[in-house]
């Protein structure tokens, strides 16, 4: 599962607003946990969170959140579930959220040339700026580390290391 995600999705530039929203929420759900935990629960999240439809999520009731707290198929964290609802509301209030998010890297992927994984930073100035702007717009669970992981996952920054099979394909 993790290898497939790495080989087929991570670091590939993504401009689809629906997938960007999904990834932003998943990165928030991951806070304090391993990414593989989130990947294993991703399909269940899609089922119970209306396919990550921001309009439907923005209207999720407190009762629905409480019901989701009983679902072992997801990460049962009330704050993260409420953040998903709040982030959906904030997402809907942003004019062209995909373009806005991509603006933090100048609208095109920032290709890095890291040799080893230890060279890859956890946070960058762009991620700090994105985090600050998202928080100002009403988003939660969007600290700089989460934002940088989001930028990596969606290909806003290309952090496959130079010895990775995906590097050559994505560095073009």
What are the functions of these language-model segments?
Residues 1-172:
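HhH-family (HhH-GPD) DNA N-glycosylase catalytic core used in base-excision repair
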């Amino acid at each position: 599962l993790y290898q497939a995600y790495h080989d087929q999705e991570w670091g590939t530039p993504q401009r689809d607003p629906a997938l960007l929203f999904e990834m932003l929420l998943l990165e928030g759900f991951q806070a304090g946990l391993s990414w593989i935990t989130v990947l294993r629960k991703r399909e269940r999240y899609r089922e119970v969170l209306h396919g990550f439809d921001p309009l439907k999520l923005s209207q999720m009731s407190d009762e629905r959140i409480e019901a989701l707290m009983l679902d072992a198929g997801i990460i049962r964290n009330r704050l993260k579930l409420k953040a998903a609802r709040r982030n959906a509301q904030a997402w809907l209030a942003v004019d062209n959220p995909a373009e806005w998010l991509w603006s933090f890297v100048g609208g095109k992927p920032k290709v890095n040339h890291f040799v080893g994984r230890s060279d890859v930073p956890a946070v960058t100035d762009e991620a700090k700026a994105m985090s600050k702007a998202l928080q100002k717009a009403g988003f939660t669970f969007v600290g700089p580390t989460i934002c940088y992981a989001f930028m990596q996952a969606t290909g806003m920054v290309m952090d496959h290391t130079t010895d990775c099979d995906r590097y050559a394909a994505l560095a073009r």
